């Protein structure tokens, strides 16, 4: 069978004369006859088997190229050998003439950890291997439990459960125990309903919630307690005064105070130092040099500013001497190092003592830093801009002690003390009193209110005197 070609519209040609018959298209007849002859030679399609006519396509179907992400590309590149090692690869096609090589392995210095693990010889190595094996067993068990963990699908997540039903005594029918009280009680008996972070239960300060005042602050204190309080206040004030004196010594006292006129005069003298002497000498030199300048210019030979450069090469003898000097310096340095080593061997005991002292100092420093860090845990934290400072102690002098509550002198405020306690316990940030800025308003008196011949300041003084007189009169009546 032949493939059927699609029919095409033939072009009509005039065949009126016999000579025009040669224009007739006989291509289809010739093609049919050629197909007949071909079938007679090789046979028709019906006579052949399917295996001769068709071929089974066993090739894999072509898939579209998948676009890899950056992470997948990074993983594929990690499996490839590094480019820095490509220079070490053998790219030659010539075979190695030496089929087998005897590699000489040098003995490594120090411990061979791999050998100690594989062939333990000491008890601590065996103990380490057993601990390592137990750790891996526990790790595999933990990973297996995590993999085989089943989710609790039987639990209804939308079901509302009251925690008071599980804890006896927290739910009553009359409603005396509220939900907030039950929640607080459950947390205190070890059955917390709301899980909180562990850091909330760590103590951050050693300060007490309510600290009793010093016994010397009593309205009728014992003489010893009152004296101890005074000593404590005096010691604190001495520290403050000492600090102020130090700051004054290193700042104000280091510089002398002068008036602006004196300062300008000193600066002028300093900047004009040596100018008067130079002016007189310069005039004399100019007169002398001007006459000799022309004569010197004629006598001096011409020369360039930069000296000519000569490329002088070292001789063999100079190079040999230079090498000898370098070798001599090297030998001298070796002798010095050998001498230093010999001296160190002689004083090895003193070096050992120095190392011990240095190690002891280092341990003391570590201990102090650890103590300082432990102490800083419980100090008042800086929760805001300002650092907490202990308030001043209230103290009465011996003549101010009343002895009874009726004549006691008020020194402090309970609200202030409580406020400082909250700041000390890291509950409130430390603040400072900020006064509101009072705007400076310039006042003018109207012309209609002015008295002739009296200024504004005089009127102000009169009003102030009148107010003081009225106040004095009111006090006398009382």
Curated annotation (Swiss-Prot):
Keywords: Nucleus, Ribosome biogenesis. GO terms for cellular component: nucleolus; nucleoplasm. Disulfide bonds: none annotated. Residues 275-287 have a biased composition (Acidic residues). Residues 90-110, 253-323, 440-459 are annotated as: Disordered. Residues 100-110 have a biased composition (Basic residues). InterPro entries: Nop53/GLTSCR2. It is found in: Nucleus, Nucleolus; Nucleus, Nucleoplasm. Residues 259-269, 442-452 have a biased composition (Basic and acidic residues). Its main location: nucleus. Pfam families: Nop53. One of its GO terms (biological process) is ribosomal large subunit assembly. The keyword Nucleus applies. One of its GO terms (molecular function) is 5S rRNA binding. Belongs to the NOP53 family. May play a role in ribosome biogenesis, being required for integration of the 5S RNP into the ribosomal large subunit. This is Ribosome biogenesis protein NOP53. It comes from Drosophila melanogaster (Fruit fly).
